[in-house]
C-alpha cells in the first residue's frame, strides 16, 4: 500500500479540508475519475479501487494514480483512557477536495474505461464522475 518512505514528523494535526482541488485536469491519460465530493481516501481504498480497475481492463492500457496518502492518522488503542499523549499512527490518508482527478486511464475503449471507473468508484467513500481529456 501507498505511504511515504520517510517524513519530517511522525504525527500531524487533524487540520481542515477546505477549498477546491489543484490537479483538476486529465493530464496523463485520456479518461479520468474526478472527485465531486470532499473527503479523505485511505491507502487501502486507493489500492482497492486500483485493483478493481486493473481487473476490469484485464491489464491492457495504462492506469495513473493521481493521489497519494501523505497524512498520518493516529488512533488510541481500545479501552484506553483519554490523555497520556497522542495515539500511534494507524493508517495514511489523502485529503480530497472537489474537482481532483483521482485516477487516469489510457489505451482502452471509452466503454471499458467507464465500466472500470464505475467498479473503482464503488470502492471509494466519495462521489465521483467520469471525465475525458479536453483538447484545446
From Swiss-Prot:
Superkingdom, taxonomy of origin: Bacteria
GO molecular function: rRNA binding; structural constituent of ribosome; tRNA binding
Record keywords, A-Z: Ribonucleoprotein, Ribosomal protein, RNA-binding, rRNA-binding, tRNA-binding
GO biological process: translation
GO cellular component terms given for this protein: cytosolic large ribosomal subunit
InterPro entries named among the record's database cross-references: Ribosomal_uL16 (IPR047873), Ribosomal_uL16_bact-type (IPR000114), Ribosomal_uL16_CS (IPR020798), Ribosomal_uL16_dom (IPR016180), Ribosomal_uL16_sf (IPR036920)
Family according to the record: Belongs to the universal ribosomal protein uL16 family.
PANTHER family (UniProt xref): 50S/60S RIBOSOMAL PROTEIN L16 (PTHR12220), LARGE RIBOSOMAL SUBUNIT PROTEIN UL16M (PTHR12220:SF13)
Function: Binds 23S rRNA and is also seen to make contacts with the A and possibly P site tRNAs.
Subunit structure: Part of the 50S ribosomal subunit.
Protein's name in the database: Large ribosomal subunit protein uL16
Organism: Photorhabdus laumondii subsp. laumondii (strain DSM 15139 / CIP 105565 / TT01)
UniProt lineage: Bacteria, Pseudomonadati, Pseudomonadota, Gammaproteobacteria, Enterobacterales
Gene name for this UniProt entry: rplP
Amino acid at each position: 500500500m501507498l505511504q511515504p518512505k520517510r517524513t519530517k514528523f511522525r504525527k500531524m494535526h487533524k487540520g481542515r479540508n477546505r477549498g477546491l482541488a489543484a490537479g483538476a485536469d486529465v493530464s496523463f491519460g485520456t479518461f479520468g475519475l474526478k472527485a465531486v465530493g470532499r473527503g479523505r481516501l485511505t491507502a487501502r481504498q486507493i489500492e482497492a479501487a486500483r485493483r478493481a480497475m486493473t481487473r476490469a481492463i484485464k491489464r491492457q492500457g495504462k492506469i495513473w494514480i493521481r493521489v497519494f496518502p501523505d497524512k498520518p492518522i493516529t488512533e488510541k488503542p481500545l479501552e484506553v483512557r483519554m490523555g497520556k499523549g497522542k495515539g500511534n499512527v494507524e493508517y495514511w490518508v489523502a485529503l480530497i477536495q472537489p474537482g481532483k482527478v483521482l485516477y487516469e486511464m489510457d489505451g482502452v475503449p471509452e466503454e471499458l474505461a467507464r465500466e472500470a471507473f464505475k467498479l473503482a468508484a464503488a470502492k471509494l467513500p466519495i462521489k465521483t464522475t467520469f471525465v475525458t481529456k479536453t483538447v484545446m
